[in-house]
Amino acid sequence: MDKSDFVELQSKTINFLRFPMAIAVVFIHTHADVGNLVDADFKFFSWQGIYNVVGVLFSHVLSHIAVPLFFFISGLLFFINFREWSWLRYRKKIKSRIYTLIIPYILWNLIPFLLFLLGYMVIGVKNHSLEEIKNFLYSTNINLFYDYHSWETVTNWFGKKVVMSGPFNFPLWFLRDLIFVSVLTPLIYYLINKLKVIFIILLLFAYLSNVWISIPGLSVLACFFYSLGAYISINLINVFAILKKYRKIVLTTSLILLFVSVVYDGMNTIIGSFFYPFFIIFMSSCVFYFAFLFVDKSHLMVGNTLISSCFFIYVFHCMPLPLFGNLNHLIRVFLLKIMPGQSPVDMVIVYFANPLFTVAICVFLFRILTMFLPRVSGAFMGNR
């Protein structure tokens, strides 16, 4: 396969992965009342056991490869045809990201906040004085776009819980971190150029150990996978040739780590936190390789409408809505009300129906917006 064919196939593979990864992100935020199998007080071969395994597998383990892959692909694409540093090319790329990343990031945090504030003032005015509302606005300020929410994630090698943060529309922490690493590409390029693979090894150790600086916007996840993609792109590495050579090792290790991660509930236990980053690296590699093979052999592609709707699915599925919470939560509440019971079988059905209905509604709303409000949707979607 010559270089032009490889680049084209790589581009098709990336486009093929976008929609499944968007669905995976919705699964991450789909509620699953589950726990690790070691401490389980139910029979494994029961509907409760099946529901637990399904919930852990899809919401706590498999779906978590989506965000690292998005960062990896972003680094890969930023440095395509970027063999030597060019400030002119950098400014051009950053300028385009003002429209594709920064403006949508601001809008998708500001609009839900204003809606939330409106509901807070109209409905809560009887319970809250104007002074309380004023203090609420004052305390929010820049946190709205930076670190409005915070939550604990993995346990690092020193036994300390790693704290993540996100803006008002909390899934957009990915977009925030992507903006940061995109701006820092001159530094990333310099370190790759000077330290070579040592730079990637250092970031790999930081990612595996989760020993890292605590600065919102500079997560080790973003820095490692974005830089890895950049390194591969800058050095013209044929990642598929490498994965093909070691495919048996990658696949076998991925399956072993998948089993361990499901047993120990992903990153939600101390043991799970140790294996979790290893699983992410191997399973992401595995998915990327087999997606490449599938596209190459079948020539099947995801429809343009579904690919174009990925960004809308990502920003809207958990967007805070006054009174309702968010779309994903609203659909879950609705499904639980119409189901005949609350048995584990019902819960499995609701669990899968929830994200699928959420995605379907998001795609429908996206089509309506692009058809009737193309300029508005263009601004909100970064002209995607």
Task: Describe each region flagged by the PLM.
Residues 184-189, 197-237:
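Loop-centered beta-sheet repeat module
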Residues 78-86, 186-194, 228-240, 263-264, ...:
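Structural signal for the C-terminal ends of transmembrane alpha-helices
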Residues 5, 50, 224, 235-312, ...:
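Alpha-helical transmembrane segments and terminal signal-anchor/GPI-anchor hydrophobic tails
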Residues 25-32, 313-321:
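Histidine-centered catalytic micro-motifs
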Residues 17-20, 191-202, 213, 217, ...:
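Membrane-interface starts of transmembrane alpha-helices
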Residues 1-203, 331-384:
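Membrane-cytosol interface segments of multi-pass membrane proteins
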Residues 200-210, 248-264, 284-289, 355-368:
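Hydrophobic core of alpha-helical transmembrane segments in multi-pass integral membrane proteins
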Residues 55-68, 161-177, 209-227, 262-286, ...:
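Interfacial loop-to-helix transition and helix-capping segments at the boundaries
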